[in-house]
């Protein structure tokens, strides 16, 4: 099972651009399975566009080693090669003392070779020192190659090669990419601009990244590095239960998915379907009303960017307000459920207002516990999730919260998951993953 991790020496070295370019280049002749280490839900949409295969998250905070291996094998078993984009620097996780949440932990769990990606601007001999330090820091890792990004030119590359080969004759130099503003990618406060906002433009951009990779990197060398003999052991006993709880329900779930709402973990969709749910996607901006369904799932996104468009679709707002089934709103979906976003009218189901701030209000892995049974969890059960938002709720006139936050921020006073309409509607900031909250799919899909 061919696999390789593209790991940065730090953040902002070009991981998403170059990893996506590698995925696109390989996809011209191979069936590529993409992955993202960590909880990011935007980067995987670029991978998916590049490969036409849905990118998945591998996260050692949400998942234990058995679950990571199980998910990896599930999605990679019929593919030619898997490319895993790391998060931050290779060793960054939730603690300065252990691997949890890091790229290194995932690489070890799936026994994957690693190609280091380094911003080599103004570096020569220091590049060799960085590589030597990374290789010696953890002997369990298999760092096989290096890619230099943002080099000045051929003379710079030759010096880099000479320095690295002098101090480390084993590491493969996979290639180097020159400084080029066309390789940059648009960002905003929560990260990259999501793919649903720029489909045609993005397709051309990703093709350019792929062409650049083919021109500058040794693709055959990447395939050679990825070709490892070790098969990943997976405990197949109760394999569904090792990932998430499964109850055979028969519900129909309508999921908000457009330019305003698109922050989802696709494993959540799999978990819902394995629990018997039929999924249908709709646009709160463009569609007249919600589809015929039993449950609404309003995920995260950028409703603050599209607040006027959402507010103008009065038929959709009326349709959701009149819906008498279960509604789950997550982060952006929570904001949509409130009275307003920055003064622009929204659904007015949760009696509070959403405002945007200049500073991050929540950025953390989350550990929480359910105070009671609710539409996404069981009383006293714990869950692991993620939060990242610049918004906050004000004028809160609700006092029924479904879960309390032990690690993280929540809505207010370490509480999250506002519950209204006798628990039929829940809105919270924590982004739930079906592995981190194994009851998520079985509870949400239940009629």
Swiss-Prot record:
The keyword ATP-binding applies. This is Cobyrinate a,c-diamide synthase. It catalyses: cob(II)yrinate + 2 L-glutamine + 2 ATP + 2 H2O = cob(II)yrinate a,c diamide + 2 L-glutamate + 2 ADP + 2 phosphate + 2 H(+); Ni-sirohydrochlorin + 2 L-glutamine + 2 ATP + 2 H2O = Ni-sirohydrochlorin a,c-diamide + 2 L-glutamate + 2 ADP + 2 phosphate + 2 H(+). The a and c carboxylates of cobyrinate and Ni-sirohydrochlorin are activated for nucleophilic attack via formation of a phosphorylated intermediate by ATP. CbiA catalyzes first the amidation of the c-carboxylate, and then that of the a-carboxylate. Disulfide bonds: none annotated. Catalyzes the ATP-dependent amidation of the two carboxylate groups at positions a and c of cobyrinate, using either L-glutamine or ammonia as the nitrogen source. Involved in the biosynthesis of the unique nickel-containing tetrapyrrole coenzyme F430, the prosthetic group of methyl-coenzyme M reductase (MCR), which plays a key role in methanogenesis and anaerobic methane oxidation. Catalyzes the ATP-dependent amidation of the two carboxylate groups at positions a and c of Ni-sirohydrochlorin, using L-glutamine or ammonia as the nitrogen source. The record marks 431 as: Increases nucleophilicity of active site Cys. Comprises of two domains. The C-terminal domain contains the binding site for glutamine and catalyzes the hydrolysis of this substrate to glutamate and ammonia. The N-terminal domain is anticipated to bind ATP, and cobyrinate or Ni-sirohydrochlorin, and catalyzes the ultimate synthesis of the diamide product. The ammonia produced via the glutaminase domain is probably translocated to the adjacent domain via a molecular tunnel, where it reacts with an activated intermediate. GO terms for molecular function: ATP binding; cobyrinic acid a,c-diamide synthase activity. Its EC number is 6.3.5.11, 6.3.5.12. Pathway: Cofactor biosynthesis; adenosylcobalamin biosynthesis; cob(II)yrinate a,c-diamide from sirohydrochlorin (anaerobic route): step 10/10. The active site is at residue 331. Its cofactor is Mg(2+). Gene3D superfamilies: 3.40.50.880, P-loop containing nucleotide triphosphate hydrolases. It comes from Methanococcus vannielii (strain ATCC 35089 / DSM 1224 / JCM 13029 / OCM 148 / SB). One of its GO terms (biological process) is cobalamin biosynthetic process. The gene is cbiA. Belongs to the CobB/CbiA family. Keywords: ATP-binding, Cobalamin biosynthesis, Glutamine amidotransferase, Ligase, Magnesium, Methanogenesis, Nucleotide-binding. Residues 252-439 form the GATase cobBQ-type domain. InterPro entries: CbiA/CobB_synth, Class_I_gatase-like, CobQ/CobB/MinD/ParA_Nub-bd_dom, GATase_3, P-loop_NTPase.
